[in-house]
Amino acid sequence: MIHPLSDIQSTNIGVNTRIWQFCVVLAGAKIGAECNINAHCFIENDVIVGDRVTVKSGVYLWDGTRLEDDVFIGPNVTFANDKYPRSKQYPGQFHGSIVKKGASIGAGAVILPGVVIGENAMIGAGAVVTKDVEATTVVAGVPARLINSK
């Protein structure tokens, strides 16, 4: 189901994926099967979203971002992909983040460029993630720090 009030330019949308109102998905984006992309999301060209991924409202996925299968992205999570942003000056390469299988990111977290979030990791709401997060760990705070690991 693609809501009629969304602008979906990509033809690479998996079966049973739902994209709600006021979303923009650019032509080069790839979204897997059984995903749920909530209202007011923006997905750039060089973005890959796996299967069974939930992206809550207000999330922008910039070039270079990779979300593996079974990932949860809470509302208003911010991904950055440019380490030194300047108006009308673009890097030779964007540094998107990778969110590994089964990881969850809480509401309002900020993920800085190039960060890798490990499998089944949990990012607390409002955290600012400045470096890679190991698999099966919980991080929270500003900057994000280890809270728990299995």
Region roles according to the model:
Residues 77, 135-137, 145:
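Glycine-centered loop/turn positions within well-structured domains
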Residues 108, 125-126:
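Low-complexity, intrinsically disordered short peptide segments enriched in small/polar/basic residues
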Residues 128, 143-146:
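Conserved switch/coupling elements of ABC/ABC-like ATPase nucleotide-binding domains
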